[in-house]
């Protein structure tokens, strides 16, 4: 059986055009302010460096995550535990 399709209730955080230095603060603000609406979507594009920074931030705050889906690996989903 395949993965369940995620339904996002909040608009995504789109990191296109954002520098790697800005990621930590933006991700923290977005996730902590919207954690009642999990799952959330953070659009990273294909940059592995951007994904790594997002994942590091999520791990620091104890959030579960999933990297994209079968058709699109350009985002990180922040999940309920």
What are the language-model segments listed below?
Residues 1-81:
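Long, charged, low-complexity intrinsically disordered regions
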């Amino acid at each position: 059986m395949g993965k369940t399709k995620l339904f996002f209730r909040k608009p995504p955080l789109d990191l296109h055009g954002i520098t790697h230095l800005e990621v930590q603060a933006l991700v923290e603000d977005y996730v902590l302010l919207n954690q009642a609406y999990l799952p959330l979507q953070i659009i990273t594009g294909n940059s592995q460096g951007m994904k790594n920074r997002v994942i590091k931030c999520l791990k620091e705050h104890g959030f579960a995550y999933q990297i994209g889906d079968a058709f699109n690996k350009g985002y990180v989903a922040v999940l309920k535990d």
